[in-house]
Amino acid sequence: RLLFTFNCRRFNNLEEIDEFAPDLVINAATVKYTIEAFNKVLPHLPEKCILSDIASVKTGLPEFYAKCGHPFVSTHPMFGPTFASLSNLSNENAIIIAESDHLGKVFFKDLYNELHLHIEEYTFSQHDETIAYSLSIPFASTLVFAGCMKHQDAPGTTFKRHLMIANGLMSEDDYLLSEILFNPHTSGQLEKIQAKLSQLQVIVENHDSEAMKHYLEEVRNNLK
């Protein structure tokens, strides 16, 4: 069925890879098993086969690629089935790692362009910094919201939207959430959240209307 419907072939054992001799292997294993999956197939791959991962967490991958003896291409589609509309990805983004093999980058640029994704090229280091900002901040903020919430019989629209995001986040794999939050750059982002919360708390406790006005103006400017 896979062969005739999707032009795919399912292998029943690793030895079938030897005969197939792929030019590119895309690793779609969960973050916890990405490197383990690579190690299992490596003995069966041609020397020039390009290794590819689409992992959201790149921990350990630069070191693995440096010693694996194969060209590689590492990318990160910045969306998932929880919130993205997979039938329309024109508003979604993808990152291609700059250190990747040229041919591998060309392949994924063509693929992501066909999906109408916006593409950015970052180094491994820049990717980690970006993830700390774009994932760790909303993840941490959502966890704080969910950690403080209690059941509401008549929730407002804003609460329901936050609740929907929280439920979506908590449906993700615990290991994935942990690894994203354990990003070395996350701690600095959490400090910024704490600083802003402390500032807001002082304003609220003092009923300082002028300070609140400036605070809200600053937030609106950040959203531009």
Identify the residue ranges that each predicted region occupies.
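NAD(P)-binding Rossmann-fold cofactor-contacting core
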Residues: 1-16
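Rossmann-fold dinucleotide-binding core
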Residues: 57-122, 128
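An accessory alpha-helical subdomain
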Residues: 121-224
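Rossmann-like NAD(P)-binding element
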Residues: 15-42
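Short, basic, helix/turn surface patches
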Residues: 16, 39, 100-107, 145-156
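ADP-ribose/adenylate-binding Rossmann-like module
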Residues: 45-61
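Redox-cofactor binding/interface segments in oxidoreductases and associated redox assembly factors
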Residues: 25-27, 52-53, 96
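Short, conserved loop/helix-junction motifs that constitute active-site signature segments
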Residues: 42-48, 88-89
